[in-house]
């Protein structure tokens, strides 16, 4: 297990003074990337070898979002490698071990030079010893969405949406999805499926609907987010 200590900063809180939903995902992503840095397999080093990890799905459950100034720790560990896929858990908790959030994430190993997934290198798997999966509900990577969607926004991809893979970072989709939810809607859990990465100059057409108390946000032809 790898752990990273953090504190809620003002730049990451929402209107209620809580760590934002997308900022929670970013904190988990940061922990994962620090893990890679500290075992000598950083994202930038992988790119030099024409390799990268891309996320294909998130399932995040919130127990409580921490408030401005509150300290917290994010833990992460992989629990499975198979073929091109890797699965990784996250746990966010207070210094007193109160669970704030936990997550499952699915990733695939990628060759940027070909634009195709590729088998995980043995050295990559060896750098991340697996541990038992977290005790949570595990769902399918794919999210089923109703068809009665309403177009609510068009977003042009600009530079500050991109990460080092030159794609829109997964946290940006989460942020944009939350922005089109009812203003007082509290996200207690979400699932996100990423199908195709948006790039600089693309236009994302955001459509929404709700059904049985669940909100669905779809980035047309790019990714599907279920909140």
Model-assigned labels for residue ranges:
Residues 60-95, 189-222:
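Hydrophobic beta-sheet segments that form the core/acyl-binding groove
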Residues 7, 87, 107, 170, ...:
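Generic intrinsically disordered, low-complexity segments enriched for polar/acidic and small residues
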Residues 1-55, 102-104, 110-185:
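Hot-dog-fold acyl-thioester-processing enzymes
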Residues 99:
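Glycine-rich acetyl-CoA-binding "A-motif" of GNAT/NAT acetyltransferases
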């Amino acid at each position: 297990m790898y752990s990273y200590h953090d504190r809620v900063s003002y730049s990451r809180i929402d209107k209620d003074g809580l760590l934002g939903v997308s900022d929670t995902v970013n904190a988990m992503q940061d922990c994962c990337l620090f893990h890679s840095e500290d075992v000598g397999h950083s994202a930038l080093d992988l790119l030099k070898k024409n390799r990268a990890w891309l996320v294909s799905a998130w399932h995040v459950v919130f127990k409580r979002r921490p408030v401005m100034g509150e300290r917290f720790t994010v833990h992460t560990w992989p629990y499975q490698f198979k073929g091109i896929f890797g699965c990784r858990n996250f746990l966010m908790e207070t210094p007193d071990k109160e669970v704030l959030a936990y997550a499952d994430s699915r990733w695939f190993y990628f060759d940027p030079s070909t634009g195709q997934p590729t088998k995980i290198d043995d050295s990559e798997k060896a750098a991340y010893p697996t541990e038992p999966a977290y005790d949570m509900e595990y769902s399918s990577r794919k999210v089923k969405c109703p068809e009665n969607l309403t177009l609510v926004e068009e977003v042009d991809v600009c530079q500050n949406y991109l990460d080092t893979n030159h794609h829109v970072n997964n946290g940006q989709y989460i942020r944009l999805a939350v922005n089109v939810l009812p203003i007082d809607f509290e996200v207690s859990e979400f699932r996100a499926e990423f199908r195709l990465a948006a790039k600089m100059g693309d236009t994302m057409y955001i459509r929404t609907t709700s059904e049985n108390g669940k909100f669905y946000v779809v980035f047309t032809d790019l990714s599907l987010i279920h909140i």
